[in-house]
């Protein structure tokens, strides 16, 4: 007796324990290039001296080498949309001068090899006699991001101390006989390496509007520069700090001084020392310095505000204790209050950098969402994006691109929390602004803009469990279809074949789209899908590619009509399969995993089988033939590839036979025996069982010396109970 090929294999419950969701993490290679604080300072001194020799009258500018960064640099082009004063060629290093004669601080990349993260400190460029005192640079922004291993629903959370693997996965299931669907969550935030960029003289730091490189205006730190514009009697320069013999205890005492310049000296010293010495953070904490710095955020003097914000940013970096203490001292509320009322770009950079650092700790997320989200959205995100709904109450003041970058980095972390995700979806104008910014960048061919990555990761996170958490038109159609099916099936013992709800493919039309989507409606709109695919086809940034694929993966991960509709929209209407297939050729295993998981979700829908067979099947089978299996994502990649091949093979056995090779079959057999990749081994066993049951493909197995007894040995009684019952 000839047995027909298995169209479905194994019941729903067989997949209950499968681990199929994935997490987004930076590549291991990029995380291994850590440098010590001493090495960074030496590099900064060398670069400063080199520029001093060539341009003695120009202020020195910090330059940090780009060590394997996933960014090409921090010089990003911005078109003039949204706000007329936005820079069209933005440099990380803004021009600035110390109004008291001593150097201000520069944002400097700090790479932590052990904790798998990129982030930035605020560092003093010139401190002590060994540094040339010729330049003053403005404070940079910071981020403090990493990952947590054990987190509900396989979402990566930004905890500071974690297992390098940093993943936990929990599958949600598709229909009977199909691979479990895969929800993705990407939250991790990164900062890139930094390069010095020239500026034209006389251009305000946050208002540059030329695309050509511009030069930093020459500045000099003289001993008689005033403390602030209104306090000419208070003067200080770097020599005063240099000769003061400051220590951490004395700097903390300075914070309580009635003299504002002493307050600033103490804060700047703490900021600088915490960049160099991790132990200084604990010392400041023990001396009660955090409380005093929080109090200084209320100072009427902007220089003191900036110094205090920069010191707090460095203090909380990589220190959960200091983060919690900052919250306990009401630091979050004070920082948000200052951000709401300040008009200083440099203070905004420091504050948004501080909030970004704080957002990496779970315990602070709820308060940050309640306190910081409204200010970040209304004062930074919405104004900078250019989106407008006619609400004149929102701020339309110029926003610096770096402030926007920091704000989106903070939201990138906050969107990983359940309460944050729901609040952001419901916040008027937020999703619209993020989508508008991404679309504008794609239209302007700025797909590798550093803020695009943050925006895409926020949109990726907001699409997580969208079908279950947000009332969509798909859910209403499903509800109507189920009711209609129930009514018809209750009238008799037989029902029309067209009324059956098989494999979640319901006989009902797809919902009509809103011509002008708003809020969460954007997340599943065809314009958003088109934007993701265009970005996927143009961007060279791995993290951006992964976020695009992850957002689409979330949209196709449900068990209902939305998954089918989104899959058909991606594969048929928008013709996005070639872009997804390109991801499988990436040298970054995170990107490959995202693409393979997305294809696995889409392969559950028979309407796509033919087009997937011609456009992606060869690439997927190549994964099973040539994938080395030596990356942390290999198990996920191979499991997804097995499920995709299995689903397509059931509809297209003849085409599958053309692409199956002896080496691929051998790899699948070897994968079944793998004890280190249980999920991939289970997927390979199911694929083998379907191959054996197919008359077109059984011969390939026999040519490799494979027989039915070997299949039973490899698969085991539990995983092949449905298969063996057919013989």
Curated annotation (Swiss-Prot):
GO biological process, one term: cell-cell adhesion
Residue numbers carrying Phosphoserine: 4, 119-120, 122, 143
Record PTM text: Phosphorylated by AKT2; required for interaction with YWHAG and subsequent localization away from desmosomes to the cytoplasm. Phosphorylation of Ser-119 by AKT2 promotes PKP1-driven cap-dependent mRNA translation and decreases intercellular adhesion, phosphorylation is promoted by insulin. Phosphorylation by RIPK4 at the N-terminus is required for its role in differentiation of keratinocytes and DSG1 localization at cell junctions.
Molecular function, one GO term: RNA binding
Annotated segments matching region Required for binding to single stranded DNA: 1-235
Any one Pfam family match given in the protein's UniProt record, by short name: Arm
Keyword Iron-sulfur: no
Region called Disordered, residue ranges: 48-69
InterPro entries named among the record's database cross-references: ARM-like, ARM-type_fold, Armadillo, Plakophilin/d_Catenin
Span list, region Phosphorylation in this region is required for cytoplasmic localization and protein stabilization: 54-69, 117-192
Subcellular location: Nucleus; Cytoplasm, Perinuclear region; Cytoplasm; Cell junction, Desmosome
UniProt key word DNA damage: no
Span list, region Required for WNT-mediated nuclear localization: 161-270
Gene3D superfamilies linked: Leucine-rich Repeat Variant
GO CC terms, sorted: adherens junction; cytoplasm; cytoplasmic stress granule; desmosome; nuclear stress granule; nucleus; perinuclear region of cytoplasm; plasma membrane
Highest taxon, organism lineage: Eukaryota
Spans of repeat ARM: 244-275, 276-317, 318-360, 361-412, 413-443, 505-536, 537-583, 584-629, 630-693
Region (Required for interaction with EIF4A1), start-end ranges: 1-287
Subunit structure: Part of a complex that contains DSG3, PKP1, YAP1 and YWHAG; the complex is required for localization of DSG3 and YAP1 to the cell membrane in keratinocytes. Interacts (via N-terminus) with KRT5/CK5, KRT8/CK8 (via rod domain), KRT15/CK15 and KRT18/CK18 (via rod domain) as part of intermediate filaments. Interacts with VIM (via rod domain). Interacts with DSP. Interacts with DES. Interacts with FXR1; the interaction may facilitate the binding of PKP1 to PKP2, PKP3 and DSP mRNA.
Family: Belongs to the beta-catenin family.
Primary role: A component of desmosome cell-cell junctions which are required for positive regulation of cellular adhesion. Plays a role in desmosome protein expression regulation and localization to the desmosomal plaque, thereby maintaining cell sheet integrity and anchorage of desmosomes to intermediate filaments. Required for localization of DSG3 and YAP1 to the cell membrane in keratinocytes in response to mechanical strain, via the formation of an interaction complex composed of DSG3, YAP1, PKP1 and YWHAG.
Protein name as annotated: Plakophilin-1
Organism this protein belongs to: Bos taurus (Bovine)
């Amino acid at each position: 007796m000839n047995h027909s090929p298995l169209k479905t294999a194994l019941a729903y419950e067989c997949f209950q324990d499968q681990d199929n969701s994935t997490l987004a993490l930076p590549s291991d290679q990029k995380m291994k290039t850590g440098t010590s604080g001493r090495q960074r300072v030496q590099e900064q001194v060398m670069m400063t001296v080199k520029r001093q020799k060539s341009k003695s009258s120009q202020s020195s500018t910090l330059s940090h080498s780009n060590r394997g960064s996933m960014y090409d640099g921090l010089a990003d082009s911005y078109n003039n949309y949204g706000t007329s004063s936005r820079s069209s060629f933005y440099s990380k290093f803004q021009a600035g001068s110390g109004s008291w004669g001593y150097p201000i601080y520069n944002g400097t990349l700090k790479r932590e090899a052990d904790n798998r993260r990129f982030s930035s400190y605020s560092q003093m460029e010139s401190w002590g006699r060994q540094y040339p005192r010729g330049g003053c640079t403005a404070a940079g922004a910071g981020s403090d991001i990493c990952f947590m291993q054990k987190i509900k629903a396989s979402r990566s959370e930004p905890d500071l101390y974690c297992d390098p693997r940093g993943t936990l996965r929990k599958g949600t299931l598709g229909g009977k006989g199909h691979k479990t669907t895969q929800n993705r969550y990407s939250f991790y935030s990164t900062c890139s390496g930094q390069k010095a960029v020239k500026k034209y003289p006389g251009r305000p730091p946050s208002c540059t509007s030329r695309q050509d490189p511009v030069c930093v205006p020459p500045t000099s730190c003289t001993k008689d520069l005033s403390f602030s514009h209104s306090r000419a009697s208070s003067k200080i320069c770097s020599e005063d700090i240099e000769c003061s013999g400051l220590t951490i205890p004395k700097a903390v005492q300075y914070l309580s001084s009635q003299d504002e310049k002493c307050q600033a000296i103490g804060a700047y010293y703490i900021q600088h020392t915490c960049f160099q010495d991790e132990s200084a953070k604990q010392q400041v904490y023990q001396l009660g310095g955090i409380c005093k710095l929080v109090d200084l955020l209320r100072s009427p003097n902007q220089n003191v505000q900036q110094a205090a914000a920069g010191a707090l940013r460095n203090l909380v970096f990589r220190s959960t204790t200091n983060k919690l203490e900052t919250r306990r001292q009401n630091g979050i509320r004070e920082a948000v209050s200052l951000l709401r009322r300040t008009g200083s770009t440099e203070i905004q950079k420091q504050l948004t950098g501080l909030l970004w650092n704080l957002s990496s700790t779970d315990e602070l997320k709820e308060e940050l969402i309640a306190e910081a989200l409204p200010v970040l959205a209304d004062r930074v995100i919405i104004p900078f994006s250019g989106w407008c709904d006619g609400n004149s109450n929102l701020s339309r003041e110029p926003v610096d691109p770096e402030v926007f970058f920091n704000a989106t980095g903070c939201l990138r972390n906050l969107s990983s929390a359940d309460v944050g995700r729901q609040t952001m979806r419901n916040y008027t104008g937020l999703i619209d602004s993020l989508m508008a910014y991404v679309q504008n960048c794609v239209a302007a061919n700025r797909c590798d803009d550093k803020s695009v990555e943050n925006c895409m990761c926020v949109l990726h996170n907001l699409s997580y469990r969208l079908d279950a958490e947000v009332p969509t038109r798909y859910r209403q159609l499903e509800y109507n279809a189920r009711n209609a099916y129930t009514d018809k099936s209750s009238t008799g013992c037989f029902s029309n074949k067209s009324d059956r709800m098989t494999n979640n493919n319901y006989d009902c039309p797809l919902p009509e789209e809103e011509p002008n989507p708003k809020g969460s409606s954007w997340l599943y709109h065809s314009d958003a899908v088109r934007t993701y695919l265009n970005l996927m086809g143009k961007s060279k940034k791995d993290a951006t590619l992964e976020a695009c694929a992850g957002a689409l993966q979330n949209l196709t991960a449900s068990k209902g009509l939305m998954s089918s509709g989104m899959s058909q929209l991606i594969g048929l209407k928008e013709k996005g399969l070639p872009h997804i297939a390109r991801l499988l050729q990436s040298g970054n295993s995170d990107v490959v995993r995202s693409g393979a998981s997305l294809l696995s979700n889409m392969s559950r829908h028979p309407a796509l089988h033919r087009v997937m067979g011609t456009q992606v099947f060869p690439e997927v089978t190549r994964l099973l033939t040539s994938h080395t299996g030596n990356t942390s994502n290999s198990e996920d990649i191979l499991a997804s590839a097995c499920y995709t091949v299995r689903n397509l093979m059931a509809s297209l056995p003849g085409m599958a036979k053309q692409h199956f090779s002896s080496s691929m079959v051998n790899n699948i057999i070897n994968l079944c025996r793998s004890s280190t990749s249980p999920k991939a081994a289970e997927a390979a066993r199911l694929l083998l069982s379907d191959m054996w049951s197919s008359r077109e493909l059984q011969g390939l197995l026999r040519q490799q010396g494979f027989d039915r007894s070997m299949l039973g040995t490899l698969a085991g009684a539990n995983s092949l109970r449905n298969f063996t019952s057919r013989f």
